[in-house]
Amino acid sequence: MVTIGNAHDDLIHDAVLDYYGKRLATCSSDKTIKLFEVEGTENYKLVETLIGHEGPVWQVAWAHPKFGSILASCSYDGKALIWKEQPETQQWSIIAEHTVHQASVNSVSWAPHELGAILLCTSSDGKVSVVDFNDDGTTSHIIFDAHAIGVNSASWAPLSNNNTKGKDTNSIRRFVTCGSDNLAKIWKFDSSKNAYIEEAVLEGHTDWVRDVCWSPSILIRSYIATASQDRTVLIWSQDNNGKWQKQLLTEEMFPDVCWRCSWSLSGNILAVSGGDNKVSLWKENLQGKWESAGEVE
C-alpha cells in the first residue's frame, strides 16, 4: 500500500488510475484535481493540478484511451467538466462544461467505449443526464428524473460479445442508478423514443443508497452491488425469469455507513469502503455465499 502525502489541502474524495495504470487522478474538497505519474510501485510524481471547479470535487473518471487523454470530473458546484491533454504540449484544458443540473453533480461515469464517448452524470437535483460527444465535436444530452430526493451514483451495464453482435448499440445502453429514496433503478435506452426507460426497481435498503456497481461481463452471471447508509450491502442477480433477486453480502451489519463498493476487473472480488475507514474484500464461495477475503485499514 502506498501513501501519497500532502497531495491536497482538504479531504480527498476519489482516486482513479487510468486505463494503463500509468497515471493517477485525485480530487478533493480543495476544489482541485491532481494528476500523478506512476513510477514503479511506490513512486507517484505530481505532474499537474487542474483548477476549474468552484466547489468540492466529488469524483473523476478517465475516458478510454481510444478517445485521447480525457478526464471527466464532477462537483458540488453543479458542473461536470471534461478535461483533455493536448499531445503536442502535454497541457490540460477544459474542452466541455456540462451545466444542466441545478444542484451538486455527485458522480460521473463513461459508458463502455464500444458505445462511443458517452458520459453519465447523477445529481442531487434528482436527475440523471447522459451526454453524447459526437464525432463532429458537438454534444447532445438527455436529462430525466430518476430519484426524487437525489441521485448518488450510477454504473453502466457491461457489454459482452454476445449482446453486441448484429445489434444496434443503442438497444444495449443500460445502467443502474441509486438514490436517497433508498432505491436502485435500472434504465434502458429506447431509441424509438430517444429516452431512457425504467426497466427495474431494486428495493431492499432502509436508508440512502450511497453507491452502486455493476460487475464486469467476464462472469457467467451478472451482479449488481448496492452500498447503503443502512450499513448493509446487497448483491443483486437475475433469476431464470429475468427478475432481480437480492442477497445480503453478510448477515452482520457493517460497523458504520457503507460509502462505496467496487468490483475487481475480473468481477470475482467486491471491495466495500465504510465510515470506519476500512476497506473489506468479499468473494463468492462455491455454495453461492459471500465470504470475507481480507481487509485493508
Swiss-Prot record:
Cytoplasm found in the keyword field? no
What keywords would UniProt list here? Cytoplasmic vesicle, Endoplasmic reticulum, ER-Golgi transport, Membrane, mRNA transport, Nuclear pore complex, Nucleus, Protein transport, Repeat, Translocation, Transport, WD repeat
Pfam families tied to this protein: WD40
GO-annotated cellular components: COPII vesicle coat; endoplasmic reticulum membrane; GATOR2 complex; nuclear pore outer ring
Q: Name one GO biological process term.
A: protein exit from endoplasmic reticulum
Gene3D superfamilies in the cross-refs = YVTN repeat-like/Quinoprotein amine dehydrogenase (2.130.10.10)
Name residues in a coiled coil.
none
Q: Which GO terms describe its molecular function?
A: structural molecule activity
The stretches annotated as WD repeats are 7-46, 52-93, 100-141, 146-197, 204-246, 253-292
Keyword Repeat carried by entry: yes
Subcellular location, record wording: Cytoplasmic vesicle, COPII-coated vesicle membrane; Endoplasmic reticulum membrane; Nucleus, Nuclear pore complex
Q: Which cysteines are joined by disulfide bonds?
A: none
Cross-referenced InterPro entries, in alphabetical order? Sec13/Seh1_fam, WD40/YVTN_repeat-like_dom_sf, WD40_repeat_dom_sf, WD40_rpt
Which superkingdom heads the taxonomic lineage of this protein's source? Eukaryota
Membrane topology field: Peripheral membrane protein
Q: How does it assemble?
A: The COPII coat is composed of at least 5 proteins: the SEC23/24 complex, the SEC13/31 complex, and the protein SAR1. Component of the nuclear pore complex (NPC). NPC constitutes the exclusive means of nucleocytoplasmic transport. NPCs allow the passive diffusion of ions and small molecules and the active, nuclear transport receptor-mediated bidirectional transport of macromolecules such as proteins, RNAs, ribonucleoparticles (RNPs), and ribosomal subunits across the nuclear envelope. Due to its 8-fold rotational symmetry, all subunits are present with 8 copies or multiples thereof.
Query: What protein family is recorded?
Result: Belongs to the WD repeat SEC13 family.
Primary role = Component of the coat protein complex II (COPII) which promotes the formation of transport vesicles from the endoplasmic reticulum (ER). The coat has two main functions, the physical deformation of the endoplasmic reticulum membrane into vesicles and the selection of cargo molecules. It also functions as a component of the nuclear pore complex (NPC). NPC components, collectively referred to as nucleoporins (NUPs), can play the role of both NPC structural components and of docking or interaction partners for transiently associated nuclear transport factors.
List, alphabetically, the PANTHER family matched.
NUCLEAR PORE COMPLEX PROTEIN SEC13 / SEH1 FAMILY MEMBER, PROTEIN SEC13 HOMOLOG
Q: What is the name attached to this protein's record? A: Protein transport protein SEC13
What organism is this sequence from?
Debaryomyces hansenii (strain ATCC 36239 / CBS 767 / BCRC 21394 / JCM 1990 / NBRC 0083 / IGC 2968)
